[in-house]
UniProtKB/Swiss-Prot annotation:
Gene name as annotated: whiD
Keyword Transcription among record annotations: yes
Induction conditions: Expressed in exponential phase. Expressed from 2 promoters at the onset of sporulation, no longer expressed in mature colonies.
Description of the deletion phenotype: Forms white aerial mycelium. Sporulation is reduced, spores are heat sensitive, lyse frequently and highly irregular in size. Septum placement and spore cell wall thickness is irregular.
InterPro entries found in the cross-reference section: 4FE4S_WBL, Whib
Descriptive protein name: Transcriptional regulator WhiD
Subunit organization: The 4Fe-4S form is a monomer; upon oxidation forms a disulfide-bonded homodimer.
Length: 112
């Protein structure tokens, strides 16, 4: 289940991008997998959802939203849940590496 505490407050301006989404009016089952869907069926559905996303004028905003709130389900902005998790994992790894590098560099420089 999504953690709604991470969602932005009730500010309609933050959500206006959704009014321009190519998926408006499209059956949401295209973007969210049914329980137990696997393999070729899941891949085909996700590819169909991504086709809608590829022609969407607010694809970047949609993907950014899904990443920001850590949306655990569905295709958002052309990214599946697995793809979003992979992106977040890579970002975490880069942050950890940068933090470790900065710490090591700071220690090597000595006192200021």
């Amino acid at each position: 289940m999504a953690d709604f505490s991470r969602l932005p407050g009730p500010n309609a301006d933050l959500w206006d991008w959704q009014l321009l989404a190519a998926c408006r009016g499209v059956d949401s089952s295209l973007f969210f997998h049914p329980e137990g869907e696997r393999g070729a069926a899941r891949s085909a559905r996700e590819n169909s959802a991504k086709e809608v996303c590829m022609r969407c004028p607010v694809r970047a905003e949609c993907a950014a939203h899904a990443l920001a709130v850590r949306e655990p389900y569905g295709v958002w902005g052309g990214l599946t849940e697995d793809e979003r998790e992979e992106l977040m994992g890579r970002a975490r790894n880069r942050l950890v590496a940068a933090t470790a590098s900065a710490s090591a560099g700071g220690e090597a420089a000595g006192p200021h």
